[in-house]
Amino acid sequence: MEQLMSLFPAISTLFTQDPVISITRIALIIFGFFLSYFGFKRTLEPLIMVPMGLGMIAINAGVLFLEAGVVGTIHLDPLVSEPSVLVNLMQVNWLQPVYNFTFSNGLIACIVFFGIGAMSDISFILIRPWASIIVALFAEMGTFATLIIGIKMGLLPNEAAAVATIGGADGPMVLFASLILAKDLFVPIAIIAYLYLSLTYAGYPYLIKLLVPKKYRGLEVEMDFPEVSQRSKFVFSVLACMLLCLLLPVASPLILSFFLGIAIKEAQIEPFQNLLETTLTYGSTLFLGLLLGALCEAKTILDPKISLIVVLGITALLISGIGGVLGGWIVYWFSKGKFNPVIGIAGVSCLPTTAKIAQKTVTEENPYAVILPLAMGAGVCGLIVSAIATGVFISTLFLLN
């Protein structure tokens, strides 16, 4: 029997661990398979779901007996903080250096923001600023509503604020905020945030169809806008970066990363732009998905606060989606029907996913209607508003403490 346990330690641990943990491991292995498969089918976002699903499978399947009979893996241990233990683990766990040097300090979030900035077009923010701002503000409804609900449900203000940032649908922002506001809940918040952000890919089209009648979904919008010069966009990015860093220094790492990406694009520094748009963006997204999957250990998922975060996370994204579409309707009414209310969903700043969802939903009703540029503008504005909301949360809580 001992020889069999030595030959197949991963299977053996299923019988030696607490039955609840063993069952959870099996459930997570199955769940990881479905995440990766639905990523393959493009039902969910493949860039995150395929590596996340495989990471989830490996971390829960590849459990073995370590020193002194301790059960664990040689992938990653996010709970270690003792320096001497951490140094030893970095020589054993292959993902430990990646986690500690890029994930737990928010660096990976900043790298992703570099790429988002380099791929963002701010022309439509400058051409129609009020339309983008109104949509973006309403799309933050979920963030502020969930903060209040979270506190009412027993979370501490800092914990509720960290969970509430899921409502902005901005993954890197959620990582950054939860690290500062609620480090002990960082892992479950990050996992749930990215799971839900990928689920918006599948769920938001139904929300749009529920809130926007068919005859309005195919509305064409005027696309004959004046051209915005690269100089104007460059100057805007520099001034916006300066102003937001002055007002919200706690969020300045993400603000700098995003606007530097825009500035590099508008200055046409092609070597940097190619680096940010391809190598850094896709490399960081790969490790982000893989690490999120590797963090889905059974012990982590069994945290009693997980169920509350699950409920609050989906509440935040649902209210934000409703708020965004409501903002779209308000702009439609004020513009006397010259704005497609579906664009409102793009104010939920999961770039570029929500903008693509908006365009796809409109195309189903009218193949000739093009709203993607306006939707991207609303999404970029939503990202900026999300950064402001996060900065306000962090600054206010620091002041209260």
UniProtKB/Swiss-Prot annotation:
It is a multi-pass membrane protein. One of its GO terms (molecular function) is lyase activity. It catalyses: N(6)-carboxybiotinyl-L-lysyl-[protein] + n Na(+)(in) + H(+) = N(6)-biotinyl-L-lysyl-[protein] + n Na(+)(out) + CO2. Disulfide bonds: none annotated. GO terms for biological process: sodium ion transport. Its EC number is 7.2.4.1. Pfam families: OAD_beta. InterPro entries: Malonate_biotin, OadB_MmdB. It comes from the Bacteria. Keywords: Cell membrane, Membrane, Translocase, Transmembrane, Transmembrane helix. The keyword RNA-binding does not apply. The chain crosses the membrane at residues 20-40, 46-66, 70-90, 107-127, 131-151, 173-193, 244-264, 275-295, 306-326, 380-400. Beta subunit of the biotin-dependent malonate decarboxylase multienzyme complex (EC 7.2.4.4). Acts as an integral membrane-bound carboxybiotin protein decarboxylase by releasing the carboxyl group of the carboxylated biotin carrier MADF. The free energy of the decarboxylation reaction is used to pump Na(+) out of the cell. This is Carboxybiotin decarboxylase.
